[in-house]
Amino acid sequence: MNTLLLKLTITTAGISLLTSNPMHGQVSPTTPKAARVQIIKGPEIEMSKELLTIIRWTSNNPGGSPEHYGVVHYGTDPNNLSQTAKSPIRLNPDHASTVFRVRLDNLKPGTTYYYTVGSMEAQGTDDGTKSVVKQFTTPAESQRARR
């Protein structure tokens, strides 16, 4: 009987180790959703190079699920923002505001892009805010790259 109990204990401990996830202990609690999410700073270009640009903005803390995404819809036609870039962020329930940063890759040098920004929960629920259409132009191709 003691051997059976020992085997059961070892098996249970092994299964527990194999199926445990240390991230479960780090998940922030869900917080009340903000009545209205507003962009309070930006959006603005944090960095722009030939092939990539990072767009940053700050909103009040949207609340809800701790896992969110900053979302940028962009394109070369202000009436057809057909491309989307997203970047994950974990909300801090103790902060009144949230800074979103989204990286746009594979851009064309010397090209004007138009964009809007917003945010959503990880499961896809939109936070209900969207910026006006803004624009930026990527730097032209460098001399070094042309050689």
Where on the chain are the PLM-derived regions?
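C-terminal segment of classical bacterial N-terminal signal peptides
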Residues: S16-H24
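Bacterial N-terminal signal peptides that target proteins for export
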Residues: M1-T9
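Short, surface-exposed linear motifs at loops/turns and structural transition points
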Residues: Q26-R147
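Bacterial N-terminal signal peptides
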Residues: T9-S16
